[in-house]
């Protein structure tokens, strides 16, 4: 399993509520509206995580990370991820996607990463949570 992570910053002239509303009800559905079936081929999960800066318990400071949302997509294989990235560059859909992103994102130049996850045992029984598959 491979996870793609994208760090997103909203446009300065929209509120966080406007950002969330548009992302959830418009942008996240764009591929489907444009006729892609499925909208994210071979994706296993697609999640948006909206950021609320909190106080650092060591310093007491609230430090904004510079991004408003972390988008994550899980893929079974690197090949699935790469095929999806190639598909996103399809000229038939690229211009519409870029125009839609300009409605909510500060830039189209958002950092895109893949991550390798390791889980540690937690909780009273000191176990790795059951939803975690072994690495």
Outline where the language-model segments fall.
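Macromolecular interaction modules
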Residues: 1-135
């Amino acid at each position: 399993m491979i996870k793609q992570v994208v760090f997103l910053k909203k446009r300065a002239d929209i509120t966080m509520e406007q950002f969330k509303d548009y992302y959830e009800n418009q942008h996240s559905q764009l591929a489907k509206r444009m006729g892609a079936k499925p909208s994210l081929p071979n994706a296993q999960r697609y999640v948006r995580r909206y950021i609320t800066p909190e106080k650092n318990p060591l310093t007491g400071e609230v430090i904004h990370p510079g991004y408003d949302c972390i988008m994550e997509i899980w893929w079974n294989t690197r090949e699935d991820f790469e095929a999806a990235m190639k598909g996103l560059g399809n000229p038939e859909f690229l211009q519409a996607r870029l125009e839609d992103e300009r409605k909510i994102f500060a830039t189209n130049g958002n950092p895109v990463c893949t991550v390798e996850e390791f889980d540690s045992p937690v909780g009273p029984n000191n176990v790795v949570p059951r939803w975690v598959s072994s690495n």
